C-alpha cells in the first residue's frame, strides 16, 4: 500500500505538469512483473528456464503421518524414503522408483509409480495395479509448483498482482499472487536474493483418503538450499511442504540432471491398468463404498456390522439406533444412515460413536452433525474434532457446509453407558500408550468388544504390531471385561482367544530370548 500511495502522490503532482495518471492496480501489476522478472533472471533467465523439458532427480525425504500418529499435534510418526524420479514437465508425467521405511517395517519396501496422461500405476515386482486420482493430483502439484514452472507461469499470468510485503524467518519478502493451473497462488520472493522462497495455495482434495476430510487445505511449500547448476540455472535442492500449518513432507535432492534423454518406455502404463484406473476413479469419487453387512451376533438382526475397508455398525436399542463409527467420507456415512433407515424404518438414530483421532476414522462425522445426531467421543479428541467440524468446505461443500448445524458432543472421560437392554453399550477410553485417544465399546450381554484401531490383521502374522494388541488386551483386563469375541475398524468378527494365543506366543519367544 505504501508503494501505491507513493506513486499516487507522485502522479498527483505530475497532473499539474504533464498530466500522467497512474492507477494503484497498474502499479501493483508493474511491480509484480518486475519482481517476477528479477526472480527469473536470478534463476538463470527465461530462455534457460523454458528450455527445461525433463529432469532426473535423486532425493531423500520423509513424511510425517499427520493423519494417524499418537497425537494430532505431534510428535508424529515418520516415514522415510529414498527415490529416483524421471520427470517430463511438458507432458506432466513422472516415474518414481522408491524405497520406503517406517513403523512396522523391518526392511525397506521397494516400489515404482508411474503417472502419465491422467493415470497412476503402482508396480511392485511384476505386479502392476491402478492407484488413485490422489497420486495424479500430487504429481501435478509437484511438477507445476516447481519454482521454474511457477515463475514462468507468473510471467504470463493475466491476473498477476503484488500484495503487501512481509517477513519470513526475519527476512523481507515481496509477495505476488496469480492463478496457476486453475488455483490461486501466492508466491514470496526474497528481497535480498530475488529468489522464490515459498508458495502458498488452498485447494480441496476429494480423492485423498486423508486430506478429503479437511475440505479446503492450506498448502505452504518452501524452497531452500539453492544451487547453481551446470548451464547457469539456479534451483533449490530442498523442498518442505506444510499443510494446515503443520509440517508434512521434506525432500533434499542429492543429484539432479536437467534435460536428460529419458527412456522411451519411462511412462508406459499397461492398458489393463488404464481401464481399472478409470473404473476405480468413477467408483471411488466419494470414497470407498459401504462394506458387506454381517450380523454381530448370529441370528440377531438388531446388531449389524458393515465389513469393508472401513468397518462400522448399527446397534438397535429400545429407544433408538446407535451408529458405531462414521469413517472415511460423508458419502460413506450417508450410505450407512440410509441402511439404518431401511433396516429399521421409523426408528430414530439417537447417537453416534467415534472412537479414534485418526482422520479417516472420523471422516464422516460432519455428516452425522448435519443430521442433528449427538456424538460420543473421547475427551482428548475435543480439540481435533472441534477443528474438524469448523473446517472450511468452500471448494467442495459437504452437507454440513450447505446447511450449518451446531454439533452436540458427549466427551467420554470414563466408563459411559449408552442405552439399556440386551444391546446396551459401555464406552471405555483406552488410556494407553498407542491408543491414548481411542475408545473401546463393550457389549456386556454378548461378551463382545470393539477394539477401535488397536487390533489389526497382520501381513506376516495374525496381527499388526503386537504392542497394539497387548495394549488392547491390557485395557480390557483393566476394566474387568469378559470378552469372547471382538471386532475393530479394520478387522472382522474374531474370537478373543486368538488375541490371547498370539500374546502368549510373543511372551514365550521373548522369555526364551531373554534366557539366551
Where do the model's predicted regions map?
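Zn-dependent metallo-beta-lactamase
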Residues: 250-318, 416
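Gly/Pro-enriched, hydrophobic low-complexity segments
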Residues: 169-271, 442-444, 451-452, 457-479
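Active-site metal-binding motif and surrounding structural segment of the metallo-beta-lactamase
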Residues: 331-376, 478-483
Amino acid at each position: 500500500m505504501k508503494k501505491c500511495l507513493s506513486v499516487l502522490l507522485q502522479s498527483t503532482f505530475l497532473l499539474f505538469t504533464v498530466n500522467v495518471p497512474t492507477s494503484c492496480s497498474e502499479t501493483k501489476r508493474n511491480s509484480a512483473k518486475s519482481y517476477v522478472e528479477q526472480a527469473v533472471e536470478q534463476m538463470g533467465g527465461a530462455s534457460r528456464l523454458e528450455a527445461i523439458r525433463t529432469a532426473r532427480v535423486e532425493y531423500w525425504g520423509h513424511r510425517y503421518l499427520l493423519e494417524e500418529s499418537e497425537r494430532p499435534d505431534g510428535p508424529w510418526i515418520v516415514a522415510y524414503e529414498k527415490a529416483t524420479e524421471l520427470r517430463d514437465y511438458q507432458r506432466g508425467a513422472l516415474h518414481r522408483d522408491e524405497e520406503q521405511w517406517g513403523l512396522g517395517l523391518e526392511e525397506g519396501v521397494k516400489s515404482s509409480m508411474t503417472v502419465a496422461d491422467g493415470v497412476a500405476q503402482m508396480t511392485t515386482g511384476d505386479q502392476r495395479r491402478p492407484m488413485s486420482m490422489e497420486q495424479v493430483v500430487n504429481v501435478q502439484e509437484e511438477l507445476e509448483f516447481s519454482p521454474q514452472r511457477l515463475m514462468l507461469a507468473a510471467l504470463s499470468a493475466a491476473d498477476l498482482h503484488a500484495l503487501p510485503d512481509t517477513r519470513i524467518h526475519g527476512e523481507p519478502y515481496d509477495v505476488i499472487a496469480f492463478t496457476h493451473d486453475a488455483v490461486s497462488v501466492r508466491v514470496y520472493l526474497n528481497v535480498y536474493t530475488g529468489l522464490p522462497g515459498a508458495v502458498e495455495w488452498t485447494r480441496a482434495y476429494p480423492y485423498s483418503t486423508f486430506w478429503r476430510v479437511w475440505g479446503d487445505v492450506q498448502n505452504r511449500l518452501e524452497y531452500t538450499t539453492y544451487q547453481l547448476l551446470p548451464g547457469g540455472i539456479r534451483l533449490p535442492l530442498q523442498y518442505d511442504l506444510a499443510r494446515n500449518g503443520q509440517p508434512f513432507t521434506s525432500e533434499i535432492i542429492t543429484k539432479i540432471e536437467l534435460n536428460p534423454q529419458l527412456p522411451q518406455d519411462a511412462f508406459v502404463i499397461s492398458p489393463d491398468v488404464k481401464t481399472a484406473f478409470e473404473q476405480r476413479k468413477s467408483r471411488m469419487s466419494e470414497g470407498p463404498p459401504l462394506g458387506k453387512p454381517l450380523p454381530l451376533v448370529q441370528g440377531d438382526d438388531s446388531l449389524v456390522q458393515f465389513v469393508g475397508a472401513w468397518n462400522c455398525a448399527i446397534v438397535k436399542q429400545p429407544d433408538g439406533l446407535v451408529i458405531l463409527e462414521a469413517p472415511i467420507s460423508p458419502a460413506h456415512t450417508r450410505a450407512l444412515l440410509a441402511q439404518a433407515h431401511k433396516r429399521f424404518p421409523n426408528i430414530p438414530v439417537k447417537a453416534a460413536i467415534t472412537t479414534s483421532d485418526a482422520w479417516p476414522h472420523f471422516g464422516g462425522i460432519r455428516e452425522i452433525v448435519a443430521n442433528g445426531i449427538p456424538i460420543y467421543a473421547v475427551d482428548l479428541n475435543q480439540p481435533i474434532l472441534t477443528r474438524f467440524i469448523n473446517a472450511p468446505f468452500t471448494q467442495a461443500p459437504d452437507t454440513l457446509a450447505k446447511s450449518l448445524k451446531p454439533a452436540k458432543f458427549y466427551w467420554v472421560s470414563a466408563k459411559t453407558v449408552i442405552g439399556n437392554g440386551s444391546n446396551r453399550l459401555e464406552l471405555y477410553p483406552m488410556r494407553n500408550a498407542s491408543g491414548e485417544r481411542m475408545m473401546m465399546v463393550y457389549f456386556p450381554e454378548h461378551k463382545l468388544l470393539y477394539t477401535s484401531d488397536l487390533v489389526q490383521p497382520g501381513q506376516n502374522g495374525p496381527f499388526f504390531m503386537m504392542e497394539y494388541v497387548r495394549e488392547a488386551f491390557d485395557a480390557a483386563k483393566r476394566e474387568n471385561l469378559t470378552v469372547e469375541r471382538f471386532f475393530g475398524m479394520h478387522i472382522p468378527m474374531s474370537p478373543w482367544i486368538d488375541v490371547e494365543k498370539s500374546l502368549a506366543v510373543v511372551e514365550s519367544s521373548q522369555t526364551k530370548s531373554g534366557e539366551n
